[in-house]
Amino acid sequence: MIIKNIPFLIAEISANHNGNFKLAKKLIRCAKRNGADAVKLQTFTADTMTIKSKKKYFKITNGLWKGYNLWDLYNKAHTPLSWHKKLFAYGKKIGITIFSTPFDETAVDFLEKLECPIY
C-alpha cells in the first residue's frame, strides 16, 4: 500500500456525493482513474455531531450554508453508514483503498467492524 519515498495520493470525497450513492461510486472511479491510491470518506451522523436545535447558536449565519442549522447541515453532508460497507467493497473491486475519518467513538467502533485499513 505505502512505499517509501513515493507519494500516497488520497482523494477526499467528504460530502461531495451530495447524498447520491451512484455519484459516490463515480467519484471513487474518477479518483482511481486519475491516479489516487486511496479515497477517504468521513464517518459521522448529525446526531453524533450536534443536537437538533433551532436556537440561534446552532444557526449558520454566513457562507455557503447560511440559513441552515448545524444538525440539518450535518444530516445533509454525512455519508450514510449503510453505504460504507458497499463503498469499501467497491473500492476493493476496482483496486483502490477506501478508508474514513471517524468523528466520534461510535464511528471508530463502526469502522473497526468493517476492518477499515486506516483512519
Model-identified regions with their sequence ranges:
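Glycine-rich, proline-tolerant flexible connector loops at the mouths of alpha/beta enzymes
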Residues: 37-78
